[in-house]
């Protein structure tokens, strides 16, 4: 931060620079009040000091004093508001950074000199009644604008009131501006419509437009013919109307896009499912036809001619010779007599079938023969043996009704286990009755 010079340094540096420059320096003022006089007014005597050149430096400050520009004139001064400048042109310069400190000091000193020059009379004596030199210098420092420095300014911005063009009406100014391109309009429209359309990001990208978009998205871009820029209506009103119309078009186009998005795949899926179903049905029918064809061929191999049966082709069964043999110039060997052929054997599972009555009778006869053979070897009591045979035959006839109730597997197990009738041979009637009882029980279990 630069340090401003004190008031005493400013007073010591004031003075006339020379006749060559346009700035006249007023020497430092010393006010002496007349105490011995009886006059009410106080006279201020101005003592002039030795004038300095423009490039001379003060012993107390290393700053140089610049020249005052010729186009700046002070016309009016007021103690409350400062100095007002009545000139139509002002020059604002951007000082160089190397001499910023010098410019600030020189501007303050020059403003003080110009203020004193305006207040002083031609004779160099000024009368001050209520304002002291220090207050006047401070006011001039705060009110007078900074004059340009003597060094070269890098950039200058000239503002002249007389050269300002007259501002055209807003209607003509708006007509002179070119209309904005459609992508920029869409770039402002889509962020407003994005919350209303949840599928916006899937179809439209605001910055660019390519041919991959659907056709109904090009409608907001095209402007209607009654909104062309060559008309006299303001462009911003036309843009607002086009924005509203584009929003309406988008609202009208959105249900169609929604319908196309959600309904289209259902039709596609239905078509695909129907095609797959028809393909499966065709395959099943082909398989069935192949199976039926094989079955038909197998059935007709016995009814066709012998030549077709050897060739393993379908015979038309024309008699006496088939048409296939005549067409292929083969000798037809004739047909086989099917009445002499045995019936086809069927491989059935007979494990669960019930035995027939003839088989049961044969098994019973075998059992009786085995029992009779064992009893005939006994020579001790023939009468008992005949009684045993009769009792066995009677019990066997009574047990025929129980054969249907006993399973065949259980009967086979009993028949496989032989009964020992030749253990203890009984010589009494009680022994013979025991043998008969054993045989009857065995018959019941069969």
UniProtKB/Swiss-Prot annotation:
UniProt entry tagged with the keyword Transcription = yes
Q: Which InterPro entries match?
A: Transcr_Regulatory_Proteins, Zn2-C6_fun-type_DNA-bd_sf, Zn2Cys6_DnaBD
Comp. bias intervals (Low complexity): 30-64, 87-97, 104-120, 185-195, 358-369
Q: Where in the cell is it found?
A: Nucleus
Output compositional bias ranges, type Polar residues. Answer: 1-24, 67-86, 121-144, 387-401
Q: Where is this region: Disordered?
A: 1-203, 336-402
Record SMART domains? GAL4
Tell me the GO molecular function terms: DNA binding; DNA-binding transcription factor activity, RNA polymerase II-specific; zinc ion binding
One of its Pfam families is: Zn_clus
Induction annotation:
Expression is induced by HAP43 under low iron conditions.
Name one cellular component (GO) term: nucleus
Q: What is its main location?
A: nucleus
* Residue ranges for the DNA-binding region feature of this UniProt entry: 305-332
Q: Cite the PROSITE patterns for this sequence.
A: ZN2_CY6_FUNGAL_1, ZN2_CY6_FUNGAL_2
Q: Name one GO biological process term.
A: biological process involved in symbiotic interaction
Q: Can you tell me which residues the record assigns to a coiled coil? A: none
Q: Which UniProt keywords apply?
A: DNA-binding, Metal-binding, Nucleus, Transcription, Transcription regulation, Virulence, Zinc
Skewed-composition ranges (Pro residues): 166-184
- Role noted for this protein: Transcriptional regulator of the switch between 2 heritable states, the white and opaque states. These 2 cell types differ in many characteristics, including cell structure, mating competence, and virulence. Each state is heritable for many generations, and switching between states occurs stochastically, at low frequency. WOR2 is necessary for the stability of the opaque state phenotypic switching from the white to the opaque phase is a necessary step for mating. Plays a role in cell adhesion and pseudohyphal growth.
What name goes with this protein?
A: White-opaque regulator 2
Where does this protein come from, organism-wise? Candida albicans (strain SC5314 / ATCC MYA-2876) (Yeast)
Q: Which gene encodes it?
A: WOR2
